[in-house]
Amino acid sequence: MTPILFIDRDGTLIEEPSDFQIDAYEKLRFVPQVIPALLKLRDAGYQFVIVTNQDGLGSDSYPRASFDGPNELMLQIFESQGITFRDVLIDCSWPQDNAPTRKPGIGLMTAYLQDRSIDWARSGMVGDRITDLQFADNLNIRGFQLRTAQFGGQWDWPGIAHALADAPRTAVVQRDTKETKIRVELDLDRAADAHISTGLPFFDHMLEQIGKHGGFALDIQAEGDLHIDEHHTIEDTGLALGQALREALGDKRGIGRYGFTLPMDETLASAALDFSGRPYFVFEGEFKRERVGDMPTELVPHFFRSLCDASGLNLNLQVRGDNDHHKVEACFKALARALRPALARQGTALPSTKGAL
């Protein structure tokens, strides 16, 4: 899905003159830092749509010919710098007309509201007036009021680009079934002590390894039917954690994608993974004991398979050694250490020739 940044024109892309009409070439001046900000957002996957009110455009007081020349030059300059606009939507009514197509109305948005390829959760609106923020509210998207001497506001273009392109990768997943109630919170861009409670102390310790050695904040709270057995709790925790990883990663733009071999005394574990969007799990290893602590060893590969299914992860996990405790822990640590480079931001490009992950 593609996020859209809807952008006001006068006062947002180009400076607004005292008479509020850019009807001559000499009035054309760009707002500071707009071009580098739009380039950053373009590289983060955004498309741009201009939405502008032009009072009485086409009337004797504001002839269309006076508007078209400067507007075309503006678009040409943006295009010369690598910035193109998906659409330019213009309302030509007067304020007193109360036209539904005039911002903050969303009458010009009909086609976009029907477009299921738009990522509305990441989309936004940038403008210099309160009506632009109201327009954003009407679309249920995030609004940014650009700071200007005329209308106030608190944002500049670098700040807007940072807020959208470098947005924190967080997720909260609540998974409730008849057998379990599980809540997972994570922040891929913040290191913090993991907080884990599943009712299975050894499983808690293993999950802590994922947050600690993966380098991200992780909180898992699980209640399950442990009076029956551990299966549902371990399986559903894997599914909830996988779903949270998928949600936090978004379109995966900028991630390392791939990623570890980890020794632990006599044990060696190897985790090779790919956030390909095609879940697949291969496990090579054997456990001699039926349980390690309160965790059945047969559920160790089952947890990882559940994680892969929910996150869209391709994981090949191998482990060999003599001590089953070491082998189980090495599996979790190897996954975590493989996650660290795979989740790390390494720019803005999508690591795929297909254009999607």
Swiss-Prot record:
Pathway: Amino-acid biosynthesis; L-histidine biosynthesis; L-histidine from 5-phospho-alpha-D-ribose 1-diphosphate: step 6/9; Amino-acid biosynthesis; L-histidine biosynthesis; L-histidine from 5-phospho-alpha-D-ribose 1-diphosphate: step 8/9. The active site is at 8 (nucleophile), 10 (proton donor). InterPro entries: HAD-like_sf, HAD-SF_hydro_IIIA, HAD_sf, His_synth_bifunc_HisB, HisB_N, Histidinol-phos, IGPD_sf, ImidazoleglycerolP_deHydtase. Residues 169-357 are annotated as: Imidazoleglycerol-phosphate dehydratase. It catalyses: D-erythro-1-(imidazol-4-yl)glycerol 3-phosphate = 3-(imidazol-4-yl)-2-oxopropyl phosphate + H2O; L-histidinol phosphate + H2O = L-histidinol + phosphate. Residues 1-168 are annotated as: Histidinol-phosphatase. Its EC number is 3.1.3.15, 4.2.1.19. Its cofactor is Mg(2+). Signal peptide: none annotated. GO terms for cellular component: cytoplasm. Its main location: cytoplasm. It comes from the Bacteria. Keywords: Amino-acid biosynthesis, Cytoplasm, Histidine biosynthesis, Hydrolase, Lyase, Magnesium, Metal-binding, Multifunctional enzyme. The keyword Transit peptide does not apply. Mg(2+) binds at residues 8, 10, 128. One of its GO terms (biological process) is L-histidine biosynthetic process. One of its GO terms (molecular function) is metal ion binding. It is found in: Cytoplasm. It holds the Pfam family IGPD. NCBIfam families: HAD-SF-IIIA (TIGR01662), hisB_Nterm (TIGR01261), Histidinol-ppas (TIGR01656), PRK00951.2-1 (NF002111), PRK00951.2-4 (NF002114), PRK05446.1 (NF003937). In the N-terminal section; belongs to the histidinol-phosphatase family. This is Histidine biosynthesis bifunctional protein HisB. It comes from Stenotrophomonas maltophilia (strain K279a). The gene is hisB.
